[in-house]
Amino acid sequence: MKKILLKMTALCLTVVLIFSGCANFDWGSFTQPWEPELVAFQDMEYTRPDPDALERKQQAVIDGIEAGDDAKTLMDKVFSFYEDYHTYYTGYALANIHYFRDLTDIYWEKEYDYCTENSARVDAALDQMLYALADCPIKEELEAEEYFGEGFFDSFEGDSIWDETFTALAEQEAVLEGKYYELSAQAAEMDVYSEAFYNGCGKEMAQLYVDLIKVRQQMAAQAGYDDYLTFAYEVTYYRDYTPQQTMEYLGDIQKQLVPLYKKADLNKYWNANKTCTEEQVFHYVRDRAQAMGGTVADAFTLLETAGLYDITYSDKKYDASFEIYISNYYEPFVFVNPTGRATDQLTFTHEFGHFCNDYASYGSQVGIDVAEFFSQGLEYLSLCYGEKNTDLSVMKMMDCLFLYVEQSAYASFEHQAHKLEGEELTVERLCALYEQVGKDYGLDIWDWDGRSFVLVPHFFTSPMYIISYVVSNDAALQLYQLEVENPGEGLKKYQDNLATMEGGFLAFVTSAELSSPFTEGRVETVRKTLEEVLK
């Protein structure tokens, strides 16, 4: 998740050049082909990326600026750099997938750690190059339509935050995140709710979170921000709403939806969450993708044909699900470690929604909130296509309520946690805060333990990500409402927007003619909808 804006910029530049139709530029291997050659996942080759070579290519761009290269000569060097940049993240993605498939594999652990620990250098090189280009004498020529485009460098005026100190802090953060994965691998063999866990791995994880918060606060300060929250929103996630808006929104959810959450009939959920095989999970998504047709069906054909998924259970796998884009092959990959229950059908659908977005846009450059709209939106739409599954519909609506409340609680916790400083920032204070947030949001209907925040990976590896689940769920729910009222409308809106280049969430919902979750009275409307569905 490091410097999401940089990756968005890299991908955006590639897409702009694909569709620019420029005839006076020899793009060579640097541009996206119209129809990429299909490569099966098993045939993808891993080569350890070389950040030293990438930095030399970055220096060649800097030297070209100083030597007075013309636009074409300079852009040749820029694209040579981008080739190495995408090759680096291709290797990183492959190492990620292979290591997470088997956390006991020492080779892939070393490769993944290597890629993780060097990612800050790579992103720093890109950032510094773009700032240098923004300050070069031929900037206006580089912003011509056939190159970067008008106004491209507006976001790169002034000084880059990626100086030696900031890069060192980012590398330190990456090392700490790697330590969390190591501890997670150890915890996989333990009862994570036992005292043995909390006094062992759990205790180490808790202190690790304190250390991560400290490093992140230092990163924000080094970048010139007063607090980490604003830094994360603006620099990491490029959001077009503020932490203050988020906290007000979470307050509305606490007021409107927590009472409904507390009185929800949990038996409806558990009774519907029946056992489910891997084959059933696969066929659920395939059947609905085929019923939806269009880009969704095409994306599933690619996934199935090239084997771009792993939904098989293993106690050696990382206990999570995700989708990742493999840049140089122009193909996404879905990873799920299933539970053996019906929820796996929705989990696979969720990650396949990300797959569709990446497939349609050759590597999506949208913000995290918009990306989550496509994953959660496909979950809702799957209920309206293929063979009717009443149990799953009940589960999804219950899950919608759970998501609003539980993910809001998690978001509230990490927002408050990153405000703790000095003597206040301790393991004991974090445990007390998590305990209180659980009570505030009604989570104490479960066997709630303030120490259990260490079991939420996003706190450690994707800080400030969780709120994206909440705001995007609101927009995704609107797709379902459209589809129920007028069959086909929700799906059309989904398919029409899959290739969007609109990065900001509020800008996206406006362009898609959806309501903002921050609109006054919106949470009350959601409450009424859920009350009607779950009565």
Show where each model-derived region lies.
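Positively charged n-region of N-terminal signal peptides that target proteins for export
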Residues: M1-K7
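Hydrophobic core
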Residues: L13, L17-G21
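A well-structured
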Residues: W27-E279, E502
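C-terminal, non-catalytic "cap/extension" segments appended to globular domains
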Residues: F156, F348, C356, A411, ...
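Active-site-proximal, well-structured secondary-structure segments within enzyme catalytic domains
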Residues: V210-N337, K396, F402-A409
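Post-HExxH zinc-binding segment in Zn-dependent metallohydrolases
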Residues: L250, Q256, S361, V366-L403, ...
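Short pre-active-site segment immediately N-terminal to the catalytic Zn-binding motif
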Residues: F333-F348
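Short helix/loop segments within enzyme catalytic domains
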Residues: S382-V405, A417, E421-G422, N486-L498
